[in-house]
Amino acid sequence: MKNSFFDVRCDEKSEKWEMAIKREIPIYLRNDIRSEFERDYTRILHCDAYRRLKHKTQVFYATKNDHVCTRMEHVMHVASVASTICKFLGLNEKLAEAIALGHDIGHAPFGHHGEDCLNSLMEQKEGANAPKKFWHERNSLFFADYIETLPDPDGIQQPLNLTYAVRDGLICHCGEIDQQGIKPRTDAMDLYSIKRPGLIQPFTWEGCVVKVADKIAYLGRDIEDARQYHILDMAAYRHIREIVASTLNAKGSHAFRSGKAVNTTVLINDLIVDLCEQSSPEKGLCFSDEYFKFILELKKFNIAHIYNHWRLREFTVYASNCLQTIYRTLMRTYDYALNGRVERALRYYPNLSGTFENWLIKHSNYKVLSSNGLIDKKKVLRYNTEAVFNIEDRESYEKCVIEFISGMTDSFAMQVFGEIIEF
C-alpha cells in the first residue's frame, strides 16, 4: 500500500534519527542545501572507489562490450530499484540511494570470483575451515571508513566520514541470503563486530530495501547480458519458460514472448510491484509466495546456465593467476618497505611501483627513503589519513597488499599482471 511505511521511515521524527545521522568525526560545515544523506550520496559519487566501478566485473569479466553490465551500472540499477520502492512505500529514498551507490565500493576485481580468490589468499595459513576473512560487504565499509578520501575546502584529503545509517547499509546489504519478511534490527552496534555477511539485518528499513533491491537488480540483467554473449541455448530458454509457467501460473510460451524473466525491465517492474503490494511494517519486506518461488528458481537457473558456464570458468583460471601473481610480487617487497625502497623494488613495473608506494604512504606508517633519511610524505601530499596498516608487522602488511589489490579494476589488474610476466 502506498506510504504504508511512512511512520517508520528514517527521518527527524524517528527514534533512530540521531544515531542514523551520526558521523565518527563532525564533518566540516559550509553553505550547503543538502540533507545528511544527500551529502553522503555525493561524497560517495566523487570518491575514486566509485569511479573505478566502471571497469569492474559484474558477471562477465573485463568486458569490452559497451552494452554489458559493469559493477557501476549494477549499483545504479540497485539505486533506481531502491528509490522506486522507497518512494512508493513512504521511506527515505535519499538514504536508500546513498547506501545503494556505495554498497559495492569495496568489491574486488573480477567479481565474486576475485572476492573468493582474495579470501583464499588470506585464509591459506589457517586452512579451509577458517572464518571468511575477505567479503566485499565488510570491505565496502572499510573503504568508506579508512581508504577513500575527498579534498576539503583547504585541499586536504579527508576521510569520507559517512553517517552511521549509510555505513550500516554498506556492510548489511548482502542480497545472497534468501529471506522473506525482512525487518531492521532495533539497536545500533559496532559494525566491525559483524563477522559474516548476511547474518545481521540493517539498522533502517531503507537499508533493508537496498538488500532486496540488490537481488531484484541483478537477476534479470544477468540473463540479458548472457543473451548478448549467446551463452544461453534453446534448452535454457525452454527452462525459463518452464520456470515462469510453474511458479507464476502463466503459459510458458506467452510469458516467453512477452519478455518475462528475460527482459530485465519487465522483470524488475513485476518484482517491485509485487514487493510493494505484499510488504507492510508488520510483515516486513516480502514477496508473494509465487514470486518468491520464482526468484529462487530463477537464481538456480542463473547459477546453472550463466555463472557456471564453461566460458566464465575458463576466465576464472586466468583471473586467479592474475591476482595471485600480483599478491606474490607485492609480498616480495616487504623487506624493501621496511627501508623505504618499495618504488625501487618495483621499478620494472611502472604501473605498479608508483601506485603501490603512494598507497603505502597514504594508508600506513611507511616512510620513503630520501637523501635526508626516511621521511613521512603524508603532510607533503596533504593526506589527513590514519595509518591503518603497520608495515613492521608482516601480517598487517599482507592485509595492506590484499586491500590494495581489492581496489584494482579488472583492466588495471590485467595490465599490472602483463608487466610482471613480460620480459
Where are these regions (language model features)?
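Active/ligand-binding-proximal structured segments within catalytic/core domains
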Residues: M72-H77, N92, A98, G114-L118
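Post-HEXXH active-site segment of zinc metalloproteases
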Residues: A98, A108-K133, Q228-A235
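An acidic- and aromatic-residue-enriched active-site/binding cleft used to recognize and process polar
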Residues: L101, G114-E115, G175, K215
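Helix-boundary capping/turn motifs
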Residues: L91, F110, F294-I295
